[in-house]
Amino acid sequence: MKRSIRLLCFLYVLCCTVFVVAQPYAIQHLGVENGLSNNFVLSMAQDKRGCIWVATEVGLNRFDGNGFTVYKQHNSEIAGDALNTLLYDEKEDVLWMGGKFGGLCAWEGKSGCFRTYQARNGMKLENIVHLAKANDGGIWITPHHYDPIYFDSRSHRFTSLSDMGIQLDCRSNLCAFADGDLLYVGHYRGGMSIIDLKKKTTRRMLHDPSVPQSLPGHSVYSLYKDRLGHLWVGTEWGLGLLDSSTGRFTVFRHVPGRISSLVADRVYDICETADGKLWIACDVGGISILDLSQITFKHPEEVCFENLLSAVTGKGLSSSNIRKVLQDSYGNIWIGNYSCGLDFISHRPPVFQICGDRPVYGMYRGEEGQLWVGGENELLLYKNDSLAKRFDICCDMLCSYGWVAAIIDDGQGFLLLGLSDNGILRTELRTGKTERVPMGIRDVRVMTFFRDTDEKIWIGTVLGLYSYTKGIVRKETELNSKLEEKSVYGILRDRQGKLWVGTYGWGLKVFDDNNRVVAELNPDTGFPDGTVNSLFEDSQGGVWIATRAGLGYVPDTRYPERYSFYGYDHGLEDVFIRAVQEDVNGEIWISTNNGISHWDKKEQKFDNYDYRDGIPMGNFIEGSACRGVDGTLYFGSLKGICHFNPQELDTSYRVTPVQIMECRAMDGRTGKGDRLILPEENGNIELPYDRNSFRITFSVPDYAQNKRIEYAYKIEGLEDNWVNIGEESQMVLRNIPPGTYIFRVKARLRNGDWDESHVAAVPFCIHPPLWRTWYAYTFYGLLLLCGLYFWMCTYKRKLAARIALAAEEKRIRDEQELNNERLRFYTNVTHELRTPLTLILGPLEDLTGH
């Protein structure tokens, strides 16, 4: 009873919802042209790394914020290409998937590998159409033609309903939802079954055309329980809200001709977003959004939905065949289409908006928020950023083609339109009637207007200066005689009363009240550029000079020669300055060829914005800029009006932490499918010396930031400096020498600071070849020691032998010398003895002879 009362109260407020047409969503499309394997999307899931997984009829896709990685049977171990459903288990980091194949397939996040589980004992596990979480952490598997099966993800055991003692009357299933002891099963052409797993009872709910509060249709495609505890049921004939105590449904259907009713009756998916809104995916219709927080009572049929339609029937979705809606952890909305891929809605609407898609030249802010815009052969009036009126000025032009280069209010109820090669037209604001203003020359090109303090309007043309007073145009002959270059692009009067005139090729001249030249800024006087595109006076009285070589600034107009000049060195990505404008906080914004830039006074540098921030890619126009009453800035370009409110730019917006997505070896043997490198148990990547080239992919998974991200990396152990690689989200490391390194990468939003607190890192080691390993060097050392030992031993033996030989030789020499000495002694003794004997024998012989 209490549950019924709560439901009635809920319906009381729900049915009183006031339909409000919200601002259109900025929707981006992703399809096969972006790398998606197939445009027929059936299911989506997000893993804890922030990656979006997309199941299609041909392949599984992982989107990492930059691009898709496709998994098919030919390049992975996935069980099949034709997928139906996905379910991610964050605790175990496993993505479960079912499809038109046998078994339950899983992708394991820790290993990056696929694994397929098959049922035993004849249990049928084919064509799985839905996977749902069980209350105990298991999974309820819904095959299309067989009873739901419970899968214990820890023990990997399958249990059928018949094993539990439960029988179902209908075996053609579409979805299931577990709520405590109850299991809700949606059937195809068979209504819905409510199974009490504890009591082992089954209750069948069918569509009865004679009972308005019965199940809305015969086939139940989706089941969802919101945060308030209400069960929503999507069928082929509408959306039902179940009162479980009575078994009755409150039914919501499409009412032809009523734009705030459910967009279509066939409901394939229901998703509740963080802001308490139900996003209802309808086939052949689009998406209906129901805000449950803003409600009063009338009648259930008067409940109002906000509807998103396809691009064919309105503005928005790329297809009306919606199968799945997912809100990721960042708050973005992902929409799966059955024919056109994915639609993406960012959680942060773009600050920079574009009105129209045709060239915009002159621009002027009128009264009551009016914005007058000059186009090609036309004058446009915008109110609240929407086109309110269009004036065709072809009949009053002197030639068949021209554009409105400048616009100004003459203060007499007319708008002056300065045309290209067509002089000046005057449009009456009250009637819209247009007439030509005589200038004394037929086809002069008007470039700019400036209203002086005395209501005199100065006119800059390619033939010099003119002035407009009370409907009469006069050529300023005296001033023109002092202009070397007659093409006047900028005019203003400073606070001292001096007239500043910027020309196309001769820089800037400053005149006093007596039309005397008091200052000149041109290349001859040292000014960097002589081509002035426009002039602007800020709220402090300073003058900004837009040139083709940068931005000049004269802070004190009493001293025109004292100026600063800003270019590439100050952070500008493009120095061709088109127009200058100031916001309500006194900040300076400029348009260039490539985009829009903001001058940061504190940092003395420019912040740059371009097409990646939503700015048109076409060139901006000289002097085409103005500020709205609410502070919105408008810049004219060749691709429409770019407008934004600088106060909506959140400079505190932080970049999502960068993630290392994968590493792949570049061994050249597998072509595009390079081998996936899996980290070891210690988290390190280990590679041999002959596979020392590999690719590291990293990304910021939040796609809302994708186009605004810049990366920097360094490799500790190889280099110590951070290298800014811009938008590049992968690094190819080639021929890394053996060693231990750490690859680090950090990210930032463009114009922001680096996120030093979330630096992603992956350690890797390049193992040396066998002959360069430590044990090889140990062996080399031992071998060297052994060689040294043997050498020393040999040397010692040689030295000993040499010493012994020397000793022997010395002994022999000594003996020889001793013998020689003895011989000499004996010889000497003999000689000494012989001499006296000879002396004795001689006389004796003489005596004997005689």
Show which residues each predicted segment covers.
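Juxtamembrane interface at the cytosolic side of transmembrane helices
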Residues: Y789-L805
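Carboxylate-rich, polar loop motifs that coordinate divalent cations or form catalytic acidic clusters
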Residues: M1-P768, R772-C793, T838-E845
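Histidine kinase transmitter module recognition
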Residues: I52, L231, E817-L818, H850
